Regions:
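Single, function-defining residue in the core of a domain
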Residues: 1-237
């Protein structure tokens, strides 16, 4: 945590965080860094190439410049249409010609606008497949804020106190996932979600389960470890 204004932070701060994370990752692990437009800087790309040697797929702006075929132009010049994805290989990113990289313009039918990605992967389909996993993180943010734990309303302003709150909320998040899985595996999901389909997330099921257990006089299980019995149970989708 650090004290700053709302919005994007600097490349230097992102790299400082990644420097802390990098020693925790096994040296033989394959790492795919997924990020939004804050991670598309030349400085970030150069750091990954020089220090981490990870794969990455990050979003970039439509006015980002790429060099391709001897021309420098913004990605918005690509003739992409709804339902169509375009890929440029061996591009140089920005006027600094950082690369070679992939540039992707993807416009899915259910989206109002295309998104633009850059990646150091060789396979455009795999790059897009990996990037789609990033959307799962958005549910984590909403679960910790507006849809679950309203930590954004804590009114805490000191970075060290916010760090402790975030740590506690993260442990509680894992606990809610455990409770949600437990409700499904034990066949009691219908007590808190009486529908024929599962509309609620595992987190939401766990939070509702925590609310109802004391009402029924049942003990509240506390665990942060998801056993194989829970993870691979036939009832869990």
């Amino acid at each position: 945590m650090y004290r700053g204004k709302k919005g994007h932070t600097t490349t230097a701060r992102h790299i400082a965080v990644l420097e802390l994370v990098r020693p925790l990752i096994p040296s033989d692990a394959e790492v795919i860094l997924l990020g939004d437009g804050e991670y598309d800087s030349v400085g970030m790309l150069q750091w990954i190439e020089a220090h981490a040697r990870w794969h990455l797929v990050v979003r970039t702006a439509q006015n980002s410049l790429v060099q391709y075929g001897g021309h420098l132009f913004p990605l918005s010049d690509l003739p992409v249409e709804p339902g169509i994805s375009l890929t440029l290989e061996n591009i140089g990113f920005t006027a600094q010609d950082c690369g070679p990289l992939l540039a992707l313009a993807c416009w899915e039918l259910d989206c109002e606008d295309p998104i633009y990605l850059i990646s150091n992967l060789d396979d455009a389909k795999m790059a897009l497949k990996y990037y789609k996993r990033r959307y799962r993180l958005e549910t984590l943010f909403s679960d910790k804020k507006s849809r679950g734990f309203p930590i954004h309303k804590s009114h805490l302003s000191l970075p060290n106190r916010l760090s402790r709150l975030l740590l506690a909320a993260s442990l509680a998040f894992i606990w809610m996932i455990y409770l949600g899985l437990s409700a499904i595996v034990t066949g009691q999901r219908t007590l808190i979600d009486p529908t024929h389909r599962q509309d609620k997330s595992l987190f939401r099921l766990g939070l509702d389960w925590l609310t109802h257990l004391p009402k029924w006089g049942q003990p509240i299980p506390l665990s942060f470890f998801l056993s194989p019995d829970l993870l691979f149970h036939k009832s869990v989708r």
